[in-house]
Swiss-Prot record:
Subunit organization: Component of the ATP synthase complex composed at least of ATP5F1A/subunit alpha, ATP5F1B/subunit beta, ATP5MC1/subunit c (homooctomer), MT-ATP6/subunit a, MT-ATP8/subunit 8, ATP5ME/subunit e, ATP5MF/subunit f, ATP5MG/subunit g, ATP5MK/subunit k, ATP5MJ/subunit j, ATP5F1C/subunit gamma, ATP5F1D/subunit delta, ATP5F1E/subunit epsilon, ATP5PF/subunit F6, ATP5PB/subunit b, ATP5PD/subunit d, ATP5PO/subunit OSCP.
Protein name per the record: ATP synthase F(0) complex subunit 8
Disulfide bonds: none
TM helices/strands, residue ranges: 8-24
Family: Belongs to the ATPase protein 8 family.
Record-linked InterPro entries: ATP8_mammal, ATP8_metazoa
GO biological process: proton motive force-driven ATP synthesis
Function: Subunit 8, of the mitochondrial membrane ATP synthase complex (F(1)F(0) ATP synthase or Complex V) that produces ATP from ADP in the presence of a proton gradient across the membrane which is generated by electron transport complexes of the respiratory chain. ATP synthase complex consist of a soluble F(1) head domain - the catalytic core - and a membrane F(1) domain - the membrane proton channel. These two domains are linked by a central stalk rotating inside the F(1) region and a stationary peripheral stalk.
Subcellular location: Mitochondrion membrane
Keyword list, A-Z: Acetylation, ATP synthesis, CF(0), Hydrogen ion transport, Ion transport, Membrane, Mitochondrion, Transmembrane, Transmembrane helix, Transport
Modified-residue entries (N6-succinyllysine), positions: 54
Native species: Dugong dugon (Dugong)
Length: 67
């Protein structure tokens, strides 16, 4: 059974990594970053819902008294 020839693996993997690095660098070079990095405060609105207007009690089946 012949052995697997791995002599070219190092140069193949190295060239692949260099190519990926160059591709990612060119992608990031074209990205425009925002100039002002100030946080934007969200507009919080309070919605009135019917279940907030009254007090309700939830009865669980296990908390009912024994019959």
């Amino acid at each position: 059974m012949p052995q697997l020839d791995t002599t070219t693996w190092f140069i193949t993997i190295l060239s692949m990594l260099i190519t990926l690095f160059i591709l990612f660098q060119t992608k990031l070079l074209n990205y425009t970053y925002p100039l002002n990095a100030l946080p934007i405060s969200p507009n919080v609105t309070n919605h009135l819902t019917p279940w907030k207007m009254k007090w309700t009690k939830t009865y669980l089946p296990l908390s009912l008294p024994l019959q």
